Amino acid sequence: MAKDIKFSEDARHAMLRGVDALADAVKVTIGPKGRNVVLEKKFGSPLITNDGVTIAKEIELEDRFENMGAKLVAEVASKTNEVAGDGTTTATVLAQAMIREGLKNVTAGANPMILRKGIDKAVTRALEELKAISKPIESKEAIAQVAAISAADEEVGELIAEAMERVGNDGVITIEESRGFTTELDVVEGMQFDRGYLSPYMISDSDKMEASLDNPYILITDKKISNIQEIIPVLEQVVQQGKPILIVAEDIEGDALATLVLNKLRGTFNAVAVKAPGFGDRRKAMLEDLATLTGGQVITEDLGLDLKSASLDMLGRASKVVVTKDTTTVVEGAGNEETIKARVQTIRNQIEETTSDFDREKLQERLAKLAGGVAVVKVGAATETELKERKLRIEDALNATRAAVEEGIVAGGGTSLINVIPAVRALLSEVTADEATGVKLVLRALEAPVRQIAENAGEEGSVIVEKLKNESVGVGYNAATGEYVDMIAHGIVDPAKVTRSALQNAASVSAMFLTTEAVIADKPEKDAPAMPDMGGMGGMGGMM
């Protein structure tokens, strides 16, 4: 395919038009008085959102060179969302400011490669200062503030703070759509996996359609049980203890399942059978997790263990097990605390080492089931459009809260970026002329988020930026009320990780943009000529 090539100024300015198109659409959403953007969907109702990365992903421009510029900035938003889960609009605003300022300097003759060094030095200094001014987050109230600011909704803030308090920092919090109008929290204590009873005759509560076992023994195996003779020895030992038993196996079928059901109906003993969760290697790992949590052993041929020789000390214990048609929940497993902690640490190490997003998600689920619990935020709304928008905001709030717990908080509303300006300005005396231009470029860009928040609130951005530069550290502009306040004291905070990621990613893409000298795009293909008209086919008039 033929290619279209543009060089130097032509290339950069074509891409800049794309950067501006995307950034201008995204930046209207920043701040408490930011607006929404409506996205057309091929099917269903349009999506109304103020989520930067969602807007950025939707933008496709007709001009291929402009589209490349837009995609570069979309990458900033996407990467920030991946690392911190929020701050995508801030990252986009910073990237646009750096690119515009940098392009002026490159056009005026600055060397882009040395300019890049100046940008890198300035951003490194800014990140050091951000780390120094960040404060750790400890109280439930502080967590609620972070979530409330991100979602622009205090009720959501309270909900997420409660979820994190209930399941801990390692717990899984999932967001689902509710059938009602209200948003509510549902917390599952203990370990839950997606496997239900193998026979409805095993239920103990016909109203709730669930089987509840108090202080049961738990037999865990990766084998398929089809012959009852294999497990009779261990069942006899459990019956002597007068306790119920939960059997977790690859499958239980035929004679074995029929015998368990028959004895349950006769009242001889209470047994519930479920299939093992997961598949393949993940199944083995999940069974090991369950064994660790309950203080039992996985009876597997890999370890030379056989069901016929299983004894009571190989079985796990828990204070309660509840089995429904689709799920099994094990509450208060009797596993050794130290063994559970060691298992948790192993999973944490695997999370850090894995490169697959899918594997990371599954490992985090396993970690939550061992270390914390699972909370489900059920999002309700009057219409489907509102539901989608609300769900996106709650996802952002949850990500922002996790980021805050990880690296602490800084003053919100772009204030922290203004606060690091003096430290970055001090670099000017330490760098060369073109590097100094790169530092000044970053200094100017650090003002951009506050400027945009003010402009979205109908104020003059430059006036507010100058006033904040003369205020003490931590004092910022509350765009919701139009007042200058101590941001942290008023609960207007940003996670340090979000601000850090936004600045780092914006600087990285801006530096790449400014050092671009040629841009190559595919030439649009010409449409093939249409078939000639088939008229004039005489002699066919009689055909019906």
From Swiss-Prot:
**So what EC number does this one have?**
5.6.1.7
Question: According to the lineage, what is the superkingdom?
Answer: Bacteria
> Which reaction(s) are listed as its catalytic activity?
ATP + H2O + a folded polypeptide = ADP + phosphate + an unfolded polypeptide
* Localization: Cytoplasm
Molecular function terms, GO-annotated: ATP binding; ATP-dependent protein folding chaperone; isomerase activity; unfolded protein binding
Q: What is its main location?
A: cytoplasm
Single GO BP term:
protein refolding
**What Pfam families is this protein classified in?**
Cpn60_TCP1 (PF00118)
Entry keyword set: ATP-binding, Chaperone, Cytoplasm, Isomerase, Nucleotide-binding
Family the entry assigns? Belongs to the chaperonin (HSP60) family.
Quote the PANTHER family the UniProt record gives.
60 KDA HEAT SHOCK PROTEIN, MITOCHONDRIAL
Q: Write out the function statement from the record.
A: Together with its co-chaperonin GroES, plays an essential role in assisting protein folding. The GroEL-GroES system forms a nano-cage that allows encapsulation of the non-native substrate proteins and provides a physical environment optimized to promote and accelerate protein folding.
Subunit record text: Forms a cylinder of 14 subunits composed of two heptameric rings stacked back-to-back. Interacts with the co-chaperonin GroES.
Q: Which NCBIfam families match?
A: GroEL, PRK00013.1, PRK12849.1, PRK12850.1, PRK12851.1
Stored HAMAP family: CH60
- The name of this protein is Chaperonin GroEL
What is the organism of origin for this protein?
Answer: Exiguobacterium sp. (strain ATCC BAA-1283 / AT1b)
Gene label: groEL
